[in-house]
Amino acid sequence: MSYSTWHDYGFGICVDDIKTTEDKVFELVHLAPNFEKEFYQWIENFREDGDPESIAELMTMDQIDKYEDRSCCMRGLGLIIKGDIEECEDIHLLACDNFNGCQYLIFSMQYPWYMSEKEKSMTEKDVYDLFNKYVSILTDEFVSIDYQEVENGG
C-alpha cells in the first residue's frame, strides 16, 4: 500500500475563514441565474435524501458522490462561490482541501491552452479584486486573500 501527497498552489482564500448567513448565501447565488437553478436542485436532492435540515448544514457537508459533477472534495460554500464566479466572470478556480480538511478556493495557473484570454491576462490585483467582490457579499469580516500552498494526500 502506498501513500502519495499532492500540492496545489495559487492565489486565493481559505473558504473556512468565511463566516456568513443563509441570507447572504442566497444573495450570492442569485447573481448567477444558471447556477441558481442548479443550486436549488442541489438543495432539493439533498433534502429528498433526508439531508440537511438547513443551508448552514449544507455549507459544511462534504459533497456526496452523486453530486461530483463540479469537483471532488468540495463542500457547499466552496461550491457556491466557485459556481458563481465561473458563471458570472468566466474564471475557473480550483477547490481543494488540506490535510486538516480546511477548504481553499484558488486561482491556479494551468496550461495556457486550458485558459481563456481573460484568465491569461489576469494580474494579482485582478485576482484579489475578484475574490474580494464575492467574499464581501458573504461577510463584512476580513478574509485573507493571498498566495496559498495547499498540501494533501491519500
Sequence positions of predicted segments:
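Acidic (Asp/Glu-rich) sequence patches and key acidic residues
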Residues: 1-138, 153-154
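C-terminal or internal capping secondary-structure element at the end of a domain, subdomain, or sheet
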Residues: 140-154
